[in-house]
Swiss-Prot record:
Its cofactor is Zn(2+). It comes from the Bacteria. This is 5-methylthioadenosine/S-adenosylhomocysteine deaminase. Keywords: Hydrolase, Metal-binding, Zinc. Substrate binds at E94, R150, H189, E219, D304. The keyword Cytoplasm does not apply. Catalyzes the deamination of 5-methylthioadenosine and S-adenosyl-L-homocysteine into 5-methylthioinosine and S-inosyl-L-homocysteine, respectively. Is also able to deaminate adenosine. It comes from Bacillus anthracis. The keyword Hydrolase applies. InterPro entries: Amidohydro-rel (IPR006680), Deaminase_MtaD/DadD (IPR023512), Metal-dep_hydrolase_composite (IPR011059), Metal_Hydrolase (IPR032466), MTA/SAH_deaminase (IPR050287). The gene is mtaD. Zn(2+) binds at H65, H67, H216, D304. GO terms for molecular function: 5'-methylthioadenosine deaminase activity; metal ion binding; S-adenosylhomocysteine deaminase activity.
Length: 435
């Protein structure tokens, strides 16, 4: 099946960050086979021609760190620091989860993400009360591209920890798929919730299965102080000593890093999922993304969960990410719009090991989203496309979402998930949680 999308303004995110006015994209099945300017007059015979009527077309956004199973916890535990928030609000509520509630919560998060322009994401879920196969089936049904990882903790007895490692290894062997729509990573929660032995076992599983690693790291000053007091090393050095960085690793946050750590992480291909809104809301601080990029680190933007954000809008994350860097460095050139867009598209895709997506180029997967600026005053005049995408647009502006060549959202309607049912069930299950 060959489909041509014509009469579009195409934000390619190629090496030149080229914007093509009055362009077209030809998709064959799941791949882009042509991106060009002007009237459609290709040598390719196509089955369908769709007039985009001047819409902006850009790569699908890539959320490098989230927790969609937590979506029912939106608005719970506001105005709290990370540790008490986790210990007194989030973990007690997660302990009440059932398989049915977890699926309902996941569906809500998926619906919000895909309708706001996210096409790919990397996720960590707490396995308590969760049917992991049902979660993976739900993500698959959404049509989204994802790395969904089972989180490991050292809670309970040594026997509990041993069982958690065994279950996580089975999960990795079952779901790791380097080139498929769904894959996974090895995901120890953090150095403050995992024993040394568990972290070493996670490193072993990642090496033996050639997977990536996903971990929360250097998120707060308290974490750095506590780990240094307990192990005599800062979190980066401690986790490295456990062997985790033998495989490409995504660290969520990286708020509290020094220059030596940034250089070390870049050398060891450790990437950062930058969660600006979550870090601000939890009072964790502001990650120095400018310094990370200057050190050669790969960085991708992320939302974290709705419980600490409180939405999954990647446009909002792009905007706050660039504004924060300009503010903390008192440098208006810090993190310009092209860089912010890169960190939410092709740069983010590289961070989570999905190089097949993130830009609109021949050979890439057909993952793209559209915005119609013609009826949106906040996107007018419509000629400064890149600026408007970062500083003015929001997830509510999305018209269409195509993932792997399939129309997942069309004219604002999600074709893969039942929006009315999902919203009804979310409210019903939320009422059942004992707060």
């Amino acid at each position: 099946m060959k489909t041509t999308y014509v009469n579009a303004t195409i934000v390619t995110m190629n090496e030149q960050n080229e914007v093509i006015e009055n362009g077209y994209i030809i998709v064959e099945n799941d791949k882009i086979i042509d991106v060009n300017s002007g009237e459609f007059a290709s040598d390719f015979e196509v089955d369908e021609v769709i007039d985009m009527k001047g819409k902006w077309v850009l790569p699908g956004l890539v959320n490098t760190h989230t927790h969609v199973v937590m979506s029912l916890l939106r608005g719970i535990g506001d105005d709290m620091l990370l540790q008490p928030w986790l210990e007194t609000r989030i973990w007690p509520l997660e302990s009440q989860f059932t398989p049915e509630l977890a699926v309902a919560s996941t569906e809500l998060g998926l619906l919000e993400m895909v309708k706001s322009g996210t096409t790919s994401f990397s996720d960590m879920f707490n396995p308590i009360g969760v049917d992991q196969d049902a979660i993976m089936e739900t993500v698959s049904r959404s049509g989204m591209r994802a790395a969904v990882s089972r989180t490991l903790f050292s809670f309970g007895t040594q026997e509990d920890e041993k069982k958690a490692i065994e279950e996580a290894e089975k999960y990795v062997k079952r779901y790791y798929n380097e080139s498929g729509m769904l894959t996974t990573m090895v995901a120890p929660h953090s150095p403050y919730t995992c024993s040394t032995e568990l972290l070493e076992e996670c490193a072993r599983i990642a090496v033996e299965n050639q997977t990536m690693v996903h971990i929360h790291l250097s998120e707060t000053e308290r974490e750095v102080r506590d780990i240094e007091a307990q192990y005599g090393k800062r979190p980066v050095e401690y986790v490295a000593s456990c062997g985790l960085f033998k495989r490409p690793t995504v660290i969520a946050h990286g708020v509290v890093l020094n220059d030596n750590e940034r250089a070390f992480l870049a050398e060891h291909d450790v990437r950062v999922a930058h969660n600006p809104n979550s870090n601000l809301k939890l009072g964790s601080g502001i990650a120095n993304v400018k310094a990370m990029l200057e050190a050669g680190m790969k960085v991708g933007i992320a939302t974290d969960s709705v419980a600490s954000n409180n939405n999954l809008d990647m446009f909002e994350e792009m905007r706050i990410a660039t504004l924060l860097q300009k503010g903390i460095h008192q440098d208006a050139t810090a993190l310009p719009v092209e860089t912010a867009l890169t960190l939410a598209t092709k740069g983010a895709a590289e961070v989570i090991g999905m190089k097949q997506t993130g830009s609109l180029e021949v050979g890439k997967c057909a993952d793209f989203i559209t915005i119609d600026p013609s009826n949106k005053p906040h996107l007018q005049p419509a000629d400064e496309v890149l600026s408007h995408l970062v500083y003015a647009a929001s997830g509510k502006d999305i018209s269409d979402v195509i993932i792997n060549g399939k129309r997942v959202v069309w004219n604002g309607e999600c074709k893969t998930l039942d929006e009315e049912r999902i919203i009804f069930e979310a409210s019903r299950y939320k009422r059942g949680l004992q707060r």
